[in-house]
């Protein structure tokens, strides 16, 4: 590979070799202007990865600026490895979500595993100890053998990495829709805890300070991974397996412990993960953020393959590597510290004052580029945006209630839809109890992890109903944030902030860019109303296969603060005789619903609507009632409507059922997906206090009959279902489809 002669600057220009690396003609002309000369092969490589959408957000920056990113608890917003939010008592929570979609489509096990590894490094590079992992996954329909393979391997990859490294995977979501068949989405989220004084930044301050490389050695895996993530998948993508990195969770476990010990040392100046674009992004970004330059000697890079060129070393995305800056003269302490963990720490450069990134190899300077040009000065594009053709058509459709003959059969069929069915097959492969801090395990509205040494907990969830967002990006964007907050509140937490993972098709298509703009508008409005700022995130574009885009899927990862663990609330019924309440009104809203998809095989019409002020009021009332000790169980009403929510609360309990009376047209009462609704149970003696605190309607009570019976307002039975049979259908659906 490396014995081939690299093309010279003139050949790069004349033969348009830069275009193969992902640069446009205009961008190459900009590079020429910045340097005042033609770039060589290595320099062209540096610009091509740093100016890719994946690293520069050149197509999405104008949209991302709409997000609210500040708040009284926000200690670090977007721009560093991960965002940080204050949780009181000198402690803070650090969290971020990232995508690993393209690699997972091609090499699902390693693609998913290294996605987990990368997001963990983003969190501990801030100085935090990772305490929990979540994920948000999208696949095609499980009837397809290829989808089964991708699903099984992605879950195995997440489990393999998370379990080995000893961080519990506590929650997440999995949804299935035909549009993800060729392009699955794998979004991984990591949550960590930190004391305020331990917060570190990825900045290279102090001229003369030493640049060191720590962790695993560099190979040829993942070269141009960032560029690969910035183009559409095609048949030829299979050939890009080398662009998928290979992870080693045991190496990463050692790296976490070594870095967390390093962070206690005053020798450390700055630290950054070598993620997308490897050594290039970590060095250029650390220099640029500090207003400094960096010189690096590439002969000193630990290499696990022979004859690597500067281009290959700079663009490799080998895993489990960090770049650190330490005070001059303190290098040996760092070497000794890492040696204790069996890890390499080598000096490979120094911080300079002139803002240049200079690379040397075999005694020659092989690249000289302004650090800011790579990190900050990528061109920004305001892409044309055009309302999707389908949108007006869907908006004009009048709301129709699907025809349902047999309510019980329909409920059982919904419980067996893979998007609604139990995800136990998934999370049983994850060790969600390791570190013994998990208070609420997977399967409820949000996971809860205790904050050791305090009475507090962290509630966390990932949410996004991409069908709603496809039908109406702005409304759907509001709903994604609101549903995440609703899940946090149902678990007894106060929503704090979000991280987002914006998964979309090709932004060069005006209709796709319109989806991006509108959904971000909706999310931003919801974040402002619910006071949950965006503290970081990730953009994943070009999620298309053969020109067909996935649904717009801006996933929301939210963390909330449980002020006292005695407030922790779960969705399952607690005891017979408790009263069942519903909060929120039900309308005949079926656009994008599970029922619509099940009956028609497609989605159409208007998405459910949401009033954010009403949402906020209800969330505040529910949280106050939970904190006052008035609530036995709480569950948000989502996919499948009230019938599914009530059934899930019964399935999670032991031997309990419920008798409930619902007003209005039966199909809507049972299965509509109207927003801002909760199913709450309350002890009989708390009835008066609860009704004073919360606007809710009592609809029935919890029974010990092991049956769910739902009546209409005339008291006619709409359905009676045995809870054991429902549980069997709900739990057995995914294993059955995988056989």
From Swiss-Prot:
Self-association and partners: Monomer. Part of the FGAM synthase complex composed of 1 PurL, 1 PurQ and 2 PurS subunits.
InterPro entries: PRibForGlyAmidine_synth_PurL, PurL_linker, PurM-like_C_dom, PurM-like_C_sf, PurM-like_N, PurM-like_N_sf
Binding site for Mg(2+) 2: 122, 273
Keyword Glycoprotein: no
Binding of Mg(2+) 1, residues: 98, 538
PANTHER family: PHOSPHORIBOSYLFORMYLGLYCINAMIDINE SYNTHASE SUBUNIT PURL
Name assigned to this protein: Phosphoribosylformylglycinamidine synthase subunit PurL
UniProt-listed Enzyme Commission number(s): 6.3.5.3
Function: Part of the phosphoribosylformylglycinamidine synthase complex involved in the purines biosynthetic pathway. Catalyzes the ATP-dependent conversion of formylglycinamide ribonucleotide (FGAR) and glutamine to yield formylglycinamidine ribonucleotide (FGAM) and glutamate. The FGAM synthase complex is composed of three subunits. PurQ produces an ammonia molecule by converting glutamine to glutamate. PurL transfers the ammonia molecule to FGAR to form FGAM in an ATP-dependent manner.
Gene3D superfamilies, per the entry: PurM-like C-terminal domain (3.90.650.10), PurM-like, N-terminal domain (3.30.1330.10)
Localization: Cytoplasm
Active site residues of this protein: 54, 100
């Amino acid at each position: 590979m490396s014995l081939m002669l690299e093309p010279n600057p003139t050949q790069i220009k004349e033969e348009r070799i830069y275009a193969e690396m992902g640069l446009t003609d205009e961008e190459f002309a900009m590079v020429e202007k910045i340097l005042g000369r033609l770039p060589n092969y290595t320099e062209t490589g540096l610009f091509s990865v740093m100016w890719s959408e994946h690293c520069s957000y050149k197509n999405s920056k104008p949209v991302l600026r709409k997000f609210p990113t500040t708040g009284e608890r926000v200690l670090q917003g977007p721009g560093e490895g991960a965002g940080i939010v204050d949780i009181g008592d000198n402690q803070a929570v650090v969290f971020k979500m990232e995508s690993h979609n393209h690699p997972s489509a091609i090499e699902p096990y390693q693609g998913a595993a290294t996605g987990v590894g990368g997001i963990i490094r983003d969190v501990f590079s801030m100085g935090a100890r990772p305490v929990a992992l979540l994920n948000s996954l999208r696949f095609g329909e499980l009837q397809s053998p290829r989808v089964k393979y991708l699903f099984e391997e992605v879950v195995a990859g997440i489990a393999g990495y998370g379990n080995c490294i000893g961080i519990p995977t506590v929650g997440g979501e999995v949804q299935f829709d035909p549009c993800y068949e060729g392009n699955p989405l794998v979004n991984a989220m990591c949550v960590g805890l930190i004391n305020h004084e331990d917060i570190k930044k990825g900045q290279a301050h102090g001229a003369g300070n030493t640049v060191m490389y720590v962790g695993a050695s560099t190979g040829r895996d993942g070269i141009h991974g960032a560029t690969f993530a910035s183009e559409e998948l095609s048949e030829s993508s299979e050939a890009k397996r080398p662009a998928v990195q290979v992870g080693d969770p045991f190496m990463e476990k050692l790296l976490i412990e070594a870095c967390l010990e390093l962070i206690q040392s005053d020798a450390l100046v700055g630290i950054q993960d070598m993620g997308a674009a490897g050594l290039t992004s970590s060095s250029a970004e650390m220099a640029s953020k500090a207003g400094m330059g960096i010189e690096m000697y590439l002969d000193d890079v630990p290499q696990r393959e022979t004859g690597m060129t500067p281009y290959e070393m700079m663009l490799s995305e080998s895993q489990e590597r960090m770049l650190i800056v330490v005070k001059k003269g303190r290098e040996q302490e760092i070497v000794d510290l890492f040696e204790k963990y069996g890890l390499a720490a080598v000096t490979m450069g120094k911080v300079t004052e002139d803002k240049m990134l200079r690379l040397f190899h075999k005694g020659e300077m092989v690249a000289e580029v302004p650090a800011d040009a790579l990190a900050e000065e990528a061109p920004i594009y305001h892409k044309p945006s055009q309302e999707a053709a389908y949108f007006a058509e869907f908006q004009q459709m009048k709301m129709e209630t699907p025809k349902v003959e047999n309510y019980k059969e329909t409920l059982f069929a919904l419980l067996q839809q893979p998007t609604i069915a139990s995800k136990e097959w998934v999370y049983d492969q994850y060790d969600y109890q390791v570190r013994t801090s998990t208070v609420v395990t997977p399967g409820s509205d949000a996971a809860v992890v205790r904050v050791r040494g305090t009475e507090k907990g962290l509630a966390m969830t990932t949410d996004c109903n991409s069908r709603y967002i496809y039908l109406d990006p702005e409304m759907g964007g509001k709903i994604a944030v609101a549903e995440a907050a609703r899940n946090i509140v149902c678990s007894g937490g106060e929503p704090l902030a979000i991280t987002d993972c914006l998964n979309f098709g090709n932004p060069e298509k005006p209709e796709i860019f319109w989806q991006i703009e509108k959904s971000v508008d909706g999310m931003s409005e919801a974040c402002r109303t619910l006071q949950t700022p965006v503290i970081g995130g990730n953009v994943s574009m070009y999620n298309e296969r053969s020109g067909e885009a996935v649904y717009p899927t801006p996933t929301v990862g939210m963390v909330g603060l449980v002020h006292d663990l005695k407030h922790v609330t779960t969705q399952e019924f607690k005891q017979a005789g408790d009263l069942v309440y519903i909060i929120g009104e039900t309308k005949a809203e079926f656009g994008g619903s599970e029922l619509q998809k099940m009956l028609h095989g497609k989605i159409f019409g208007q998405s459910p609507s949401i009033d954010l002020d009403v949402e906020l009021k209800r969330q505040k009332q529910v949280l106050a009632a939970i904190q006052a000790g008035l609530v036995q169980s709480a569950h948000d009403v989502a996919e499948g409507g009230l019938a599914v929510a009530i059934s899930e609360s019964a399935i999670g309990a032991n031997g309990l059922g419920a008798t409930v009376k619902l007003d209005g047209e039966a199909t809507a009462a049972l299965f509509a997906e109207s927003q801002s609704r909760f199913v709450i149970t309350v002890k009989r003696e708390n009835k008066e206090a609860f009704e004073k605190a919360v606007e809710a309607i009592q609809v029935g009570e919890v029974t010990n009959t092991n049956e769910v019976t739902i009546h209409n307002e005339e008291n006619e039975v709409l359905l009676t279902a045995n809870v054991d049979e429902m549980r069997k259908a709900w739990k057995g659906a995914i294993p059955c489809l995988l056989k």
